[in-house]
Regions:
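Two-component histidine kinase catalytic core, primarily the HATPase_c
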Residues: 42
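Phosphopantetheine-dependent thiolation modules in NRPS/PKS and related acyl-activating systems
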Residues: 2-38, 46, 53, 57-85
Length: 85
């Protein structure tokens, strides 16, 4: 999976959790909770759906790394590569 494909998966999951989110103005380094008013339940659903969609286990202790688009890409890219390898 390329980084662009991974980004599309992440954005698709955001759309599911926050359909009103303006993804055109998404800032890669800004926290999702600040940009989309994610509640803690929304964030938990986001992380869980990413795990399901990607087939990659993400320990709860690592959820903090998924707080931004940049963090998601940094954390998930090597895991996707390892899974495919």
């Amino acid at each position: 999976m390329t980084q662009d494909e991974l980004k599309e998966v992440i954005l698709a999951v955001i759309r599911e959790i926050a359909p009103e989110a303006d993804l055109v103005r998404l800032e890669a380094s800004a926290k999702f909770r600040d940009q989309f008013e994610f509640s803690s339940v929304d964030f938990l659903n986001f992380a869980t759906r990413l795990q399901d969609r990607l087939g990659i286990p993400i320990p709860e202790t690592d959820f903090i790394q998924l707080a931004t688009l940049a963090g998601c890409l940094f954390y998930l890219t090597p895991k996707c590569i390892q899974k495919e390898g």
